[in-house]
């Protein structure tokens, strides 16, 4: 009996936390595949305004272009 109550409580807590996560971070569930396209159009002012996460994405994009594996995706 206790284990059923514990499982139900765990399931409800997961559902509630998932609901609040989607309400707090709705953009995290949107597909943003054009982020790399946005990095193609950077100028000096844009580079100065980049967040650390953008710099990581820019570095990953540059490494992907430099790698030999990139040719396999074309």
Swiss-Prot record:
Tissue expression profile of the protein: Expressed by the venom gland.
GO cellular component, one term: extracellular region
Chief subcellular location: secreted
Entry keywords, A to Z: Antibiotic, Antimicrobial, Secreted, Signal
GO biological process entries: defense response to bacterium
Signal peptide: 1-24
Protein's UniProt keywords contain Amino-acid biosynthesis: no
Compartment list: Secreted
Record's function text: May be an antimicrobial peptide.
Family: Belongs to the non-disulfide-bridged peptide (NDBP) superfamily. Long chain multifunctional peptide (group 2) family.
Annotated protein name in UniProt: Anionic peptide clone 8
Organism for this UniProt entry: Tityus costatus
